[in-house]
């Protein structure tokens, strides 16, 4: 009898412990992006950007396990693959071996994720190799006026880099509450090696509401561009941009969105190999966005010093630092072959059509015109389609 009672007690305890343990659930994360971006800059002599066409598609499936330890906290581990194809980049040889598609698989993605709902805020974190679209520095423009990151100048990350360098290798932490959003990330861009520089970039963004029509925030980045096995020479590139954003919707009720944002942009640059010391660069930017239903206009005007002073400076390997050092829009150089400290103007004017199709689908057709103090530099015709199915759970129906 005692043995039976003891066995029943142990069985009951085991059942209670098993019931208390979180049950893992299979999850998947799927992203698809199609981009057509025709760039014509002959009008300005291709001073800042060469004419070219980006026409490519990407699929990023990932599968894993979610472990909800409570109603407020969930841990996730996922692994996937980045599948990418530049349209028209097929092999020309008739040899079967050269026609296989293994080259479409660019790199593995694998990451740990945390979702935590706190009493007054939501905390999310990722560590590993994960899609850049989880960050405001990698997410595409959406029709939502409340979407954080709409006010990030292209100085911090160019459209092309946002598309081609689609993964973060490091860590991302975000925090949000009603009316505010904050994030910081570390992206390890290069491991010290032969012909490969050690480099990393830290980026941060924050925005919070002060009044119903006024918000304040910041955008910041620190890029450390260091040595390779063959060459020595370190460059530090720091950019900080506090901003104020005004919602003018009440003044223009006939429009769906009217927003005016003012950025102060402070750059601090240093080329240690050339002993430049800390070189500051000052500037300001005003951004006006107007939207009515599916049609909008966004105009960004920057005036100030060049924010990419070493773009054309030869590095220790004899090649200009260029886009390897500066990950933003090259028009923020302001001048080429001139003193970067002389202030100048850059104007980016975009007309777009962006219908609301579905919450997980973003379609955007745009024409983007670029102007400097020399006049019209060129324009882009863009069509982008983005599909994001994030952290969907595969539930067991049995």
What are these regions (language model features)?
Residues 20-118, 379-398:
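Beta-barrel outer-membrane channel/assembly domains of diderm bacteria
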Residues 43-47, 93-96, 153-157, 187, ...:
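Extracytoplasmic loops and strand-loop junctions of Gram-negative outer membrane beta-barrel proteins
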Residues 10-19:
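Hydrophobic h-region of N-terminal signal peptides that target proteins for export
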Residues 69-71, 158-164, 336-338:
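A short acidic, glycine-rich active-site loop
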Residues 121-207, 222-224:
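Surface-exposed coil loops of outer-membrane beta-barrel proteins
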Residues 33, 56, 177, 181-182, ...:
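Exposed, low-structure sequence patches enriched in small/polar residues
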Residues 1-4:
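Positively charged n-region of N-terminal signal peptides that target proteins for export
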């Amino acid at each position: 009898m005692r043995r039976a009672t003891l066995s029943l007690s142990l069985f009951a305890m085991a059942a209670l412990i098993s019931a208390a343990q979180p049950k893992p659930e299979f999850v998947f994360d799927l992203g698809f992006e199609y981009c057509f971006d025709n760039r014509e800059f002959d009008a300005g002599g291709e001073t800042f950007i060469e004419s070219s066409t980006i026409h490519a598609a990407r699929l990023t499936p990932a599968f894993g396990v979610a472990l909800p330890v409570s109603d407020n906290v969930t841990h996730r581990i996922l692994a996937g693959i980045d599948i990418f194809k530049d349209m028209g980049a097929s092999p020309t040889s008739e040899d079967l071996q050269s026609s296989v598609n293994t080259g479409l698989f660019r790199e593995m993605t694998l990451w740990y994720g945390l979702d935590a709902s706190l009493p007054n805020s939501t905390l999310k974190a990722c560590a590993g190799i994960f899609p850049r679209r989880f960050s405001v520095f990698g997410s595409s423009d959406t029709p939502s006026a409340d979407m954080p990151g709409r006010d990030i100048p292209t100085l911090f990350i160019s459209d092309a880099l946002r598309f081609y360098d689609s993964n973060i290798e490091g860590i991302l932490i975000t925090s949000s509450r009603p009316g505010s959003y904050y994030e910081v990330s570390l992206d390890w861009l290069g491991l010290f090696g032969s012909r490969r520089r050690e480099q990393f970039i830290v980026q941060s963004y924050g925005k919070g509401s002060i009044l119903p029509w006024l918000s304040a925030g910041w955008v910041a980045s620190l890029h450390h561009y260091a040595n390779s096995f063959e060459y020595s020479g370190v460059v530090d590139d720091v950019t900080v941009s506090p901003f104020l954003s005004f919602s003018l919707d009440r003044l223009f009720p006939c429009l769906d969105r009217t927003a005016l944002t003012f950025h102060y942009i402070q750059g601090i640059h240093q080329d240690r190999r050339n002993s430049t010391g800390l070189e500051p660069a000052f500037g300001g930017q005003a951004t006006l966005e107007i939207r009515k239903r599916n049609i909008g206009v966004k105009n960004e005007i920057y005036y100030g010093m060049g924010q990419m002073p070493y773009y054309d400076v030869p590095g220790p390997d004899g090649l200009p630092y260029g886009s390897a050092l500066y990950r933003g829009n090259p028009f923020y150089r302001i001048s080429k072959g001139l003193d970067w400290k002389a202030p100048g103007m850059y104007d980016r004017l975009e007309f777009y059509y962006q219908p609301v199709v579905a919450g997980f689908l973003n379609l955007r057709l745009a024409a983007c015109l670029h102007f400097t103090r020399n006049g019209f530099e060129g324009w882009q015709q863009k069509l982008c389609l983005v599909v994001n199915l994030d952290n969907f759970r595969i539930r067991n129906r049995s």
